[in-house]
């Protein structure tokens, strides 16, 4: 059984037992979370979501991704600036997919 959920402005295909990386959400490690915006379950397509469907998961880790370097550079001018950014993420283990 699989489902497509919408979280953090993205659509993610999930299955029970799978661990996924999503945009940071509030919560501590081992907190239970429920995803309510289910777009599809096993080929049943929602309009736009499936009413009463839920995907339950557990937060495994809150962390930050690898640092990326952003360089601002203007030729022929004395402007050369380097910025760093680490995107926060949440690692979630999918426990259960239920359709009403």
Curated annotation (Swiss-Prot):
> What is a single Pfam family found in this protein's UniProt entry?
Ribosomal_L21p
| Superkingdom per UniProt | Bacteria
Q: Which GO terms describe its cellular component?
A: cytoplasm; ribonucleoprotein complex; ribosome
Q: Which UniProt keywords apply?
A: Ribonucleoprotein, Ribosomal protein, RNA-binding, rRNA-binding
Give GO BP annotations, semicolon-separated: translation
Is Protein biosynthesis given among the entry's keywords? no
Q: State the SUPFAM superfamilies in the record.
A: L21p-like (SSF141091)
An example molecular function term from Gene Ontology annotations: rRNA binding
- Record family assignment: Belongs to the bacterial ribosomal protein bL21 family.
* Subunit (UniProt): Part of the 50S ribosomal subunit. Contacts protein L20.
Function comment: This protein binds to 23S rRNA in the presence of protein L20.
The protein's name in its UniProt record: Large ribosomal subunit protein bL21
């Amino acid at each position: 059984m699989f489902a497509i959920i919408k979280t953090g402005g993205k659509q993610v295909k999930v299955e029970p037992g799978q661990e996924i990386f999503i945009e940071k959400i509030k919560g501590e490690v081992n907190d239970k979370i429920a995803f309510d915006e289910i777009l599809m379950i096993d080929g049943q397509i929602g309009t736009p979501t499936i009413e009463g469907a839920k995907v339950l998961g557990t937060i495994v880790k809150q962390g930050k991704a690898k640092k990326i370097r952003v360089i601002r550079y203007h030729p022929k001018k004395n402007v050369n600036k380097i910025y760093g950014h680490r995107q926060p993420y949440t690692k979630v283990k999918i426990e259960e997919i239920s359709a009403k």
